[in-house]
Structures are given as structure tokens and as C-alpha cells.
Amino acid sequence: RYWPWLSTPLLALATLAWQPWLALLFSALFLVGLNDLRQPHRSVLRNYPLTGHLRFALEYIRPEIRQYFIEDDEAEYPFSRNQRALVYARAKGQNDKRGFGSLKNMYSPNAEWLLHSNRPRHADPKTFRITIGGPNCRHPYSASIFNISAMSFGALSANAIRALNKGAAAGGFMHDTGEGSISPYHREFGGDLVWEIGSGYFGCRDAEGRFSPERVQEQATSAQVKMIEIKLSQGAKPGHGGVLPAAKVSEEIAATRGVPMGQDCISPASHSEFSTPTELLQFIARLRELSGGKPVGFKLCIGHPTEFFGIAKAMLETGITPDFIVVDGAEGGTGAAPAEFADHVGMPLRDGLRLVHNTLFAIGLRQRIKVGASGKIVSSFDLLRVLALGADWGNSARGFMFALGCLQSLSC
């Protein structure tokens, strides 16, 4: 394991008279190997001086090699090449049709298909929209069945926010702000907004970081804000808070979120304004009143089913119901999540969606409460699948990121 390094001084001597620049190169390589032996941080380099760097180089480019040359077109980790290619083609206005037949194995154990009719009809455009708003909502919202899921300013750039909202305005669908609140870039093109309020109460907090009803009223009464969504948890890291380091809190982000510059921007794991199902519903009623009667609901990734049953029971006891519930699947994405949370915490979308739909149906409230779904929805088949399982509409985040140019490098 040492001979490649030990050969470098011999090669330097052998080439000194013939090619001095080669001798200089081999001498430099000898010094690199000597430093590898003395450094205390990487045992691989101490055991394999000089050649150990090859291991790190190969490890560095492994994801790209695998994605471009080895990965199967249908390997969904997290999105398959075929899924990404479909979004890329449609985002660019290119031909997305395929010839010769499907590449899928129709007889595989995981094969899925839709049942068609022998008498197909042209779809009525009205069927692509739903009305969100319960009996206590004074300003129901006519929403598209496919929308932009929550992604915050700060996680996305100003230009990305602009592009998404411009698309929402052109396509007539809603744009979820994410818990980072409403930035000036969300307002440039006038696309419909769903204002997400997380545990940090960004955009609706006072100087001490407490919930501010006045700030809520100021933001929520804007004509562009169509609904308010309380974030209880997200699929990619349910039960986990978040920290935006002080170094990343720019002047724009600080102004948008209502946080001081030079300090970490912290999202606690849970809300401080409520702690029980009844208090959650009372908070929903309070936000609905502050917004002037706009639809208010919450987003969650299902954990213990009994906790959602508790919320459902509180709806019956108090008579207060959310206008909508968004079920976020554990397969959802985020900028950064601990591996254990991303891989092993939370209920996948299809299971969580069935639980929410069946629970609301069982207690007689399904007709009053609309249900959204988010988690790996990029095609019309993905959308139809969740609609068949009980959802009223679907949201997509990473699908729109692909449309913006995301390459799935997994280095968010």
C-alpha cells in the first residue's frame, strides 16, 4: 500500500535530467503522501498515502456516474429518470409522447393501471377545480386540483419564487408559500397564494417572536392570499424543527420572516399557540376570523393514528372544523433532514391519505372538509392515484423544482 508513494522520489530522480517538470511533479506527489501520513483526520490516507485520494475522488463522482450511466430508467430514488424526463420535456414545451409501446412490465407485482371507459368524453374544465370552504368560511376558494406545494423563500431563490408564482398566475393554480412567509417576490405576478404558518410564526410574529394577531390580519386580508395553512408537520422530517443559521439570514429573509439579522432563525418542533386538539381547532377559528373568513386548514404527516382520531373527536365535540387538511407523505422532500427522519419517520402518503379520508367519512365530516395530498406527485397518473384514494387535490414541490431546472443531484 506504500509502494506507489515510495516510488515517487525514485521517479523524480529518474526524470530529473530528462524532463525536469516531471521530476517536480513527482516531488510534489511525494510531499502530498508525506502529509497524508502525518495528518490525523483520515485513516484511509494514513494507511494509503497518495492513492487514498483516488478513493475520495471516486466517492465524490459516484452519484453522477450512477445517475447518468448505471441507474435504471425506472429506479425511483427518489425520482426515476423517466419521471424527471417527462417533467423536463413538458416544462420546455417539447414533445413528451412515446413510440412503440410502454417500457413498463405490465405483469410485475407492483404494476398499476387505470380503468378506462368504452364511452370516453371530453373533460369539462369545471371538473378540474374544487371549492374549498366549510360552513363557517365566508370566502370560499375555487382551487385547481394540481398546485405548487410548500417551498419557502430562502430555501428557494428570489428568481425561483418569481417563476413559480408567474406560472401559478398563468395556469390558474395556487402557490403555497412554505413556512418562510410571503416575500415581495411572491407578490410580483399576482398568483394565488396559500400562506403557510409554521411553528416559528414567520411573517406573523412580534419582536419577541410571539404570535401576533395584528401581523396575521395585515397579511391574510391581502386579496392575493386565498387560504391559510397551519403546518403541524412535514413528511420529510415529521416531528423535527429546523434552524436557518445566522450566516444565511439575509436582510431580505429577515424582513420577510420578521426575525433579527445576525441570529439563528429557529423553527421549533411544535407550536406554542396550541397543544391540544381543541386548542388547534380554536386557533383555526381565530385565524379564520382574523383573515376575514378565508379558508383555514392544516398540513400534517400522519404519525400515531390515535392523535388524528383525537383531532377528529375534537371536531365533533366543539363543532369547529378546518376547511381543509393536507396530508403530506413521508416520501416528501426537504432541503435538509436527518437520515433517520427522512427514511424511517412518518406514514407514507397513500396510507396516511386513506386514514384521513376514512376517518372523516366515518364521523360524517368528509363533505365539509376538503383533503389535499402531497408527496412525489409529478404526473397526471400520480395525481389520479391520490384522487382515487380520497384526495380532492394534489400538490407538487419537487416536480416544479424539476421544471425550474433541478437535476436531482441530492446536494440541496
Regions found by a protein language model. Name each.
Residues 222-277, 281-282, 289, 334:
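Active-site cores of enzymes that catalyze phosphoryl transfer or operate on phosphate-rich substrates
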Residues 1-174, 180-190, 195-207, 211-236, ...:
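Conserved, well-structured core domains of diverse proteins
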Residues 266-412:
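Glycine-rich phosphate/ribose-binding loops and adjacent secondary-structure elements
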Residues 206-207, 241-242, 407:
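Short conserved micro-motifs at the rims of enzyme active sites and ligand-binding pockets
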